[in-house]
Amino acid sequence: MLAKRIVPCLDVKDGCVVKGVQFRNHEIVGDIVPLAARYAAEGADELVFYDITASAHDRVVDKSWVSRVAEQIDIPFCVAGGIKTIGQARELLAFGADKISVNSPALSDPSLISRLQDEFGRQCIVIGIDSFYDAASDSYKVKQFTGDEAATKETAWYTQDWVEEVQKRGCGEIVLNVMNQDGVRGGYDIKQLSLVRQLCDVPLIASGGAGTMAHFRDVFIEAKVDAALAASVFHKAIINIGELKQYLAAEGIAIRL
């Protein structure tokens, strides 16, 4: 059995790591490189960095800190933020990123996924999906440009349909960001993640809602995800990654210690 992965997420804005609640009201958490080094030392399996306003403001993630992170850590990391061309992706990979993730740019131009896959191979192409549960229609819908509250907009895609589309186009991994759960630490959305898991032939990463160690256990066992991403519980030192992994191993979950 493949080991499950623990993935701290660092949202970056104006050169600092920030964290919001339900994608709003972001507060500064700390500096990028020291936080990355801390999580690597604690035992994170990989890191994800989102330049959260890049797509909404029509720019690409700042490469200067990407190279500094690559020099400081020895675990894989993924970078996202406004990547719209093969050249931009190539540059970020050359600066040391192991994977690149696209979200809003893929919604604007789905062919980007196929082009990235053709150029670099699907193993380093991650698709982020910002999924919002709409109670009125009892459905999951995809939102775009979520890094800037003023720029956030609805798309025509239902989450399940977009999950199938991005796989057809060649993504290697999917991060499902459950917007309703983000930052509230009430647990992952097991129902939605389980639904997506049934449609997903590539690795699925759960994002949004981690508050306790049991939440990680539950999402691995019940939703059968491949990795669990979290931010605020790590930023606020509510959960130590090494202790989390010991707990999960004791609960019978395959994990790298």
Swiss-Prot record:
Record-level GO cellular component terms: cytoplasm
Chief location: cytoplasm
Record carries keyword Transport: no
Pathway(s) this gene product operates in, as recorded in its UniProt entry: Amino-acid biosynthesis; L-histidine biosynthesis; L-histidine from 5-phospho-alpha-D-ribose 1-diphosphate: step 5/9
E.C. code: 4.3.2.10
Highest taxon in the source lineage: Bacteria
Subunit composition and interactions: Heterodimer of HisH and HisF.
Role this protein plays: IGPS catalyzes the conversion of PRFAR and glutamine to IGP, AICAR and glutamate. The HisF subunit catalyzes the cyclization activity that produces IGP and AICAR from PRFAR using the ammonia provided by the HisH subunit.
Name the record gives this protein: Imidazole glycerol phosphate synthase subunit HisF
UniProt organism field: Shewanella sp. (strain MR-7)
Lineage: Bacteria, Pseudomonadati, Pseudomonadota, Gammaproteobacteria, Alteromonadales
